[in-house]
C-alpha cells in the first residue's frame, strides 16, 4: 500500500484483517507526539508555518510544490507516516445523494456513474471502523444506518457555552 493516510490505512487494515500480509510505503518520516503544534508555546505561528496544510507554505523535507492556482479546490496534503490524517479533525462527512447527481439536479459537471446507495455499505463499514459518533436521524446528514457510537458529550466547557447561548433567547 502506497501511503498511510486515511484511505491507505483503511485499506491496509481491511486487507490485514482478512489475512493478507501488507506492506505500507510512505513518503516521509514518523511525526512524534511532542512535534505537534499543540505542544508548542507558539501554536498559532506553528500552525501557519511548519504545520500549514499547504506544502508550498510548509516546505517540509518530504513536501513537493503543488500548483492549484487554476482550481477552487486546495488539497490538504501532508507527506509523513499517516499522511493528511495528521491534520485530521475527526470530521467524517458523507456525500449526500444529491452530490452524485450534479448534472441532473444542477446542470453542472457530470453525474457520477454510481449513487450514494452504491457506496452506503462502505460508508457504514468505515463509520464502524472509525467508531464515528453522532445523532441518528440527523436531517443535516445523508441517510445512514445507526451510528456506531452515541454523540460525544459537550463536556464542561461546552455546557457553559450552551448555557450562555440559551440565555441569549
Roles of regions detected by a PLM:
Residues 64, 91, 103-169:
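Conserved redox-cofactor binding core of oxidoreductases
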Residues 1-104, 108, 113-117, 121:
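N-terminal glycine-rich phosphate/pyrophosphate-binding loop and immediately adjacent elements
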